Design a protein with these regions (language model features):
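Extracellular beta-strand-rich solenoid/capping regions of secreted or surface-exposed proteins
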Residues: 2-8, 19-35, 42-63, 68-87, ...
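Beta-rich catalytic cores
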Residues: 47, 77, 100, 133, ...
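A cross-family glycoside hydrolase active-site/sugar-binding cleft signature
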Residues: 15, 105, 160-162, 201-202
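Solvent-exposed adhesion/ligand-recognition segments of exported proteins
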Residues: 1, 12-15
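Acidic/polar N-terminal loop/beta-strand segments that form early-domain functional surfaces
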Residues: 14-17, 37
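Right-handed parallel beta-helix
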Residues: 31, 36, 57-68, 85-98, ...
Length: 213
């Protein structure tokens, strides 16, 4: 799998099912489709490291599970999956959990969709420098759609909308003149369940237009 995703212009299918024990972060290249639905039986589960989209545009990932856990390489950025400053990404029928930081964070992306996914069971005390954590994710972007997702069993950020935080004046770049231009999000038909004593679904600084249904 690592060899396949390290090169662009790939459609990846599976002849077998089971666990893939990652030895480092899995970086997905551009112009890639990972068709997890082609795996027989119980499908494909990635373990121990992050599924990362920070270097990829034009990507489709379907029916993949990512279980980060604290078994290896505990660090403050250990999400089950994440990516920002990318475009044209679809995550469909995936399941993400057991993160040290956030389960699934996607913001500052353009033309992004996460649909029919499970974002659950962020680890509470897994070695994060800030102590107890257990966060669902930071979401947002320009023309970003989050629909029919299940967010459950996290302490906080279920999710947190903060999606234009690095694409307006005052942060990394001046791609847009302000946060209102930088963010347009559609959030609908999602279920948020069993968040902890922190905030459930809420907004942070650097936000723009968010449609919640």
């Amino acid at each position: 799998l690592r060899d396949a995703v390290s090169q662009s212009n790939r459609i990846i299918v599976f002849d077998v099912s089971g666990y893939i024990d990652l030895k480092s972060q899995l970086n997905v290249s551009s112009n890639t489709t990972i068709a997890g639905q082609t795996a027989p039986g119980d499908g494909i589960t990635l373990r121990y490291y992050t599924l990362y989209f920070g270097k990829s545009d034009n990507v489709i990932v379907r029916f993949i599970r990512s279980r980060r856990s604290q078994v290896k390489d505990v660090n403050d950025g250990a999400d089950a999956t994440w990516g920002r400053n990318r475009k044209n990404i679809i995550l469909d029928h995936c399941s993400f959990s057991w993160s040290i930081d956030e389960v699934a964070s996607f913001y500052d992306n353009k033309d992004f969709t996460m649909q029919w996914c499970n974002i659950t069971e962020a680890l509470a005390n897994a070695g994060h420098d800030k102590g107890a954590h257990s966060y669902g994710g930071i979401w947002g972007g320009k023309n970003a759609s989050f629909h029919h997702n299940f967010i459950a069993h996290v302490q906080n950020r279920a999710p947190r909308f903060n999606g234009a935080r690095y694409n307006w004046s005052g942060y990394d770049t001046n791609l847009y003149q302000n946060s209102i231009q930088a963010e347009r999000v559609d959030f609908r038909n999602c279920v948020m369940y069993n968040w902890g004593s922190g905030n459930g679904c809420y907004g942070g600084p650097g936000g723009g237009y968010v449609n919640m249904v």
